[in-house]
Amino acid sequence: MIQVRVSGTKYRKARRSWFHLRRIGLRKDRYGAYTGELKGRRQVEKLKRYCEKKRLSFRIDNEYGRRGGSYRSIFFQTHAPAFGNYYFCAYCGRLLPKDRVTVDHLYPVGSASRDLKLQKKLKRHIRGINDPDNLIAACRACNQKKGTEMGRWIRRGKIGRHAWYWELRWSFRFALAAGVIFLAVWLIAVR
C-alpha cells in the first residue's frame, strides 16, 4: 500500500495533482492523504518519480515499514544477557543494565519504509523490520547518533551484537596494555 501525504506549503500542489493520483488508483482518505494499493515495482517507481517531481511526500506502508509495539519484549525474550542482567551496546561495547538498554533496529524503520531496494534485501534475510535478527541492544547515545543512517552502523551492529567480540576486544586491549607496562618495567630494570 502506497500513501501519498499532503504536507504544509505543498498542499496546493497536491490539490492540483489529485487527478493524476486518482487515475493511478489512489483515493483520498479522511486524513487528507491519498492511499491505495499498487502492484508491481514499476508502478511504485513511477509514482515515486512523480511525487519527487511534484514535491509531494510519500511513504511505502508495508510490513518492512511498520514499527511494532512489542519489539522491546521480543528482543528480551530472544536475546540472553551477556553477564547476569547486563547487555553490551552493539556499537560501542558499553555494558548496560537491562533497564538502560535501548532496543534499536539495525536496519532503520524509516529507511525500510521508503527504500524499495532495502525492502527487497530485507525480504531475503529477515521476516520483517521487527524480526529478532534486526533488533540489537544499544546505549541511548549510540542509538541517537545512528538515527536513520546505515553504512558503517550496520557493520558495527552486526559484529558488535555478539558478546564474544567485545570480550575478545577487551582481552586484546588488556593484553596490549599489560605488554606495554611489562616492556617499560623491563627497560627500566635493564638500565
Model feature map: region roles:
Residues 88, 102, 138:
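The −1 position to Zn-ligating cysteines in a subset of zinc-ribbon hairpins
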Residues 93-135, 150-152, 157-159:
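Histidine-centered nuclease catalytic patch
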Residues 117-140, 165-186:
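Short Fe-S-cluster ligation motifs
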Residues 9-11, 84, 96:
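Short proline/glycine-enriched turn/loop motifs at strand-loop junctions of beta-rich domains
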Residues 1-64, 150-191:
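Extended charged
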Residues 109, 142-145:
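Phosphate/oxyanion-binding loops and surfaces in catalytic or ligand/nucleic-acid-binding neighborhoods
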